[in-house]
Amino acid sequence: MTYANDSAHFDLDKTEESKPRIALMGEFSAGKSTLSNLILGESVLPTKVTATRLPPVWVAQGDDAPFRMDMRGDVHEIDLNALDRVRPDDTAVIKVHKPVDLLGMCDVIDMPGISDPNMTTAAWDDLIQSADAVIWCTHATQAWRQSEAATWEALPHTLQDRSLLLLTRFDKLISERDQAR
């Protein structure tokens, strides 16, 4: 089923009554999806899905059917068990609804890795403009790479001011010196 720009199904415009939208950003395998699953208390996507092959995944409260919005703004219902058929180059966002209490307070947007060759900066730029804050996940063993710093600098300063840096995989730091840094 296709809905041409049907705002009843998907609305990127902020309204006064909209909930905060928290974007999870960082490099590939930095723990964004793991963090999403942890804070939501359940896996959002089937475990067989390779997150690095997905466009942004927007999770909101509810039980509506999942869908994807293509680059033209058209909305298409999707099967979460067939996400391997979703083309990241033609999908602006996947929206999934879950009956999770936390989602009554905020939406979560799980962004692809910032170095994803399948997604241009322009493709996620429109979506990140909808975010109210970012939780930036970075590997503790390789924290704050040049690519992360460059992407961070490209974000609106108002968004930077309301965001957090989360060091993931801290347990991989073995020496006390590395842990102290």
Model-derived regions: residue spans:
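N-terminal pre-Walker A segment at the start of P-loop NTPase domains
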Residues: 1-18
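Globular "head" domains of long coiled-coil molecular machines
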Residues: 16-181
